[in-house]
């Protein structure tokens, strides 16, 4: 399917009147506007996905996602498998569209550097559960949950010459999660009671498990 058809499909699906067809001139105008919004040339409309680079494909996906002017955009690994320069360009495009639409972006990813650079607030999940939530600068400067601490310690830096230390044990099975702290299983501990949320700073909350609280501290 050509790129122009993929861009128009979503618009047709969300029309109030399914019989209200766009003229060819209107289709061309809409497609060119969407492509321009993500810095792609009009000629891309006549291309097929296999003819595009990874960065171009991601820009088309962004154009489709923003075509209906959403209030919330969910970006799941938007820069996966892209090189660093293309990653930055894609995220800048997404950020520019976000500002223009006055939308919120939920950025899902495992690249902590990317999260730190492009997010205002961050939520860290372990075994499908949130374990720490707060302003991104606060969480990265002073992580309180051991899993967050270990994730940040794993980030390579020019000044860090030490060996990186992995997390022991195996991840908890999502089919058999404990009632208590799932991270405790990684370090040979068991909790059977529900872990409370604690406010540790302004807008900064963690799952406060006493058995693993100090794990990973330097």
What kind of feature is each model-predicted range?
Residues 1-13:
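Q-loop/switch helix immediately C-terminal to the Walker
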Residues 12-15, 23-43, 152:
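Conserved ABC ATPase "signature" region
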């Amino acid at each position: 399917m050509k790129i122009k058809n993929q861009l128009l499909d979503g618009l047709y699906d969300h029309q109030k009147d399914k019989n209200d067809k766009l003229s060819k001139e209107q289709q061309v105008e809409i497609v060119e506007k969407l492509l321009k919004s993500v810095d792609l040339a009009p000629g891309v409309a006549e291309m097929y996905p296999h003819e595009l680079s990874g960065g171009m494909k991601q820009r088309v996906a962004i154009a489709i996602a923003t075509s209906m002017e959403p209030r919330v955009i969910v970006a799941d690994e938007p820069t996966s498998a892209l090189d660093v320069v293309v990653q930055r360009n894609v995220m800048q495009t997404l950020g520019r569209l976000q500002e223009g639409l006055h939308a919120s972006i939920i950025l899902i990813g495992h690249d902590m550097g990317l999260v730190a650079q492009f997010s205002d607030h961050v939520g860290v999940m372990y075994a499908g559960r949130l374990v720490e939530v707060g302003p991104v600068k606060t969480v990265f400067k002073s992580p309180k949950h051991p899993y967050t601490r270990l994730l940040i310690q794993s980030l390579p830096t020019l000044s860090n010459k030490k060996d990186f230390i992995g997390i022991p044990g195996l991840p908890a099975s999502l089919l058999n999660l404990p009632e208590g702290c799932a991270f405790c299983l990684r370090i040979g501990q068991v909790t059977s009671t529900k872990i409370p949320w604690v406010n540790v700073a302004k807008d900064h909350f963690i799952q406060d498990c006493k058995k693993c609280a100090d794990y990973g501290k330097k």
